[in-house]
Amino acid sequence: MSNYTEEINRRRTFAIISHPDAGKTTLTEKFLLYGGAINLAGSVKGKATARHAVSDWMEIEKERGISVTSSVLQFEYDGYCINILDTPGHQDFSEDTYRTLMAADSAVMVIDASKGVEAQTRKLFKVCGMRGIPIFTFINKLDRDANDTFDLLDEIEKELGIATCPVNWPIGSGKGFKGVYDREKKCVISYSDTEKGTKEGTATEIPIQDEARLRELIGGEAADKLLEEVELLDGASAEFDLSEVRAGKLTPVCFGSALTNFGVEIFLKHFLNMATAPLPRKADTGLIDPAENEFSAFVFKIQANMNKAHRDRVAFMRICSGKFDAQMEVRHVQGNKVMRLSQPQQIMADERKILSEAYAGDIIGVFDPGIFSIGDTLCMPKDKFQYEGIPTFAPEHFARVRQMDTMKRKQFVKGIQQIAQEGAIQIFQEFNTGMEEIIVGVVGVLQFDVLKYRLENEYNVEIRLENLPYEHIRWIENKDEVDLEKLTGTSDMKKVRDMKGNPLLLFVNAWSVGMTLDRNKGLVLAEFSRS
């Protein structure tokens, strides 16, 4: 096997998804701790330590203790090269999370043991199901009082429609949490103090057959309960089948506490053994194989002003095939231009490392002078194919945006367009108006705060937001067949265009959508756009 193929085969690229506050960012931190990428894990809430989490780099994230942008983190562990796509956990950021899932080969789903399957978990799971990627479950916060373990598994199966297979089993919860039982090794693993999770800690392993030592370690009552549960589990749970896991039909489940490091490294090791190396990707010419094809990639995220001093803009690309070399020329398919990618770098939070090479599965950031859009394909100059586009999902909240100081119009237009190109917001214009009348659409209302904050802090522009009553927006799929001037809807319907010139319709409620379809026979409306 060539070094080139070996490099691709040792890549594991995955996203971490969860409902808000399930512990996703904390788990990410602990992965980095075990990988040696950081020496001290920062508490997201800032209670045990004043450190900020490495993956929460933007000022607004540090202030609020939530992730609002998707970070890309890479580290080495046990011979693997791991790329974590740390997605926003707040419920307002599902569209950015969706785009990030397009760049992942698998997903780690974090569930709070005291709450079970929550609303955001269902939504994100559905997105993973659409792509058919494997899902690995980490049931977190066993250091707090948890729901019954069998009930948690039953809830995952019923709510999400996926079979579960526990890889390990928790011993107690809350103050009685002793550790985990590893089903494969048939041993109980207990942990020493980890200084509130900021250090790795050391593990004690005892075979479950050694009842005397087991009772000494976890107590007689806990030992009896564990032995009973293991017997029940071995007879009742689904058999492990790796092919079912990789098809997204069976989720391996691990239990632990990211905050105190219980079960984290066990989960990481099992995940790396089961998850796939980069897989072939669908393009308009067919499947593109990671190892057999030369370099290709697609843009899944754009972030402006990552370095405030330099007013820069970075396009994040997922390499899908081949090897990237910093000196090579590549084709930007949508722009039909051959170019060298400027300042290729690996970015861990706000720290950067210039790259000379990267492989399929890796995420690289490149300087973007404003030519890239989300979903763009890059490949070798002799090739010309496009990866499937990333859908634009319908926003659910709308506001009219006005600048407070008309003398700063240039900064206002630049700022709002850059933030829109990153995919954080969508901007629309009413028919026959200019940029002075902008309607902003967001998936969640917190993005309005982010927009206001970023315009003030990065572009020195103050804005006023006027909330609008619209809750539904639809793209006109057959726009070439529709006379927009003659299109009639309800009195509350508004016609707008997106920044690409596509016509859309805004509605106050679902009834208005239905009435408009009834009044305009042949009209085809869509909840998302690929154009």
Label every PLM stretch briefly.
Residues 1-531:
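Structural and coupling elements of P-loop NTPases
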